[in-house]
Amino acid sequence: MSHASIIASSEFFSAASPAVIDAIAASAQEKSLVRGDVLFKEGDAPDALYIVLSGRIAIAIDNKPLDSRESVVALMVEGNLFGDLALLDGGARSALARALEPSTVLRIPYSAVEPQLSNTPDLLCGITRVLARRLRAMDEALADSVFLDVTGRTAKRLLELSEGKDEFVLPVTQEELAGMVGA
């Protein structure tokens, strides 16, 4: 699949014209990662967004300096886009992104996207949908942390990870699952 078709299939760029997609794709580069590789850390200066081509990427917030635990706030799989928040507000990275297994991502420099935001207001529609979905997910996670105990949060997350199947292979380690549910 070409970089342009990968970018076009992302809801983030759903309102972009083929010409805009091609302009963005011209600057995109694939990056291979091994388990444990960190794409960026919380506080880093941002310069790109990413689309997962293969593997899994954890988006996590750590609890330092209190202890070495981290909370996995999102699990990015094939087709997911991440690293976009700083594109919109210019702030530093708000979390870290780490490969959970051998992975490949498509790196899209902000410098390729920013001019398109000014020239293509429709592009903001797809971005707004993505951000609204993430905000709803964070609202739900906050409610879960308040109203469900660890057992309830674990059961709910396992149901989500099963994708409705009766039998499935758990795609995360016990430690990663604990980070996802705040245990």
List each model region and its residues:
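Cyclic nucleotide-binding regulatory module and flanking cytosolic helices
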Residues: 1-35, 86-88, 119
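Short loop/turn microsegments at loop-to-beta-strand junctions
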Residues: 28, 46-48, 168
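Short, solvent-exposed loop/turn segments that connect beta-strands within catalytic domains
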Residues: 64-70
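Cyclic-nucleotide recognition modules
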Residues: 72-132, 136
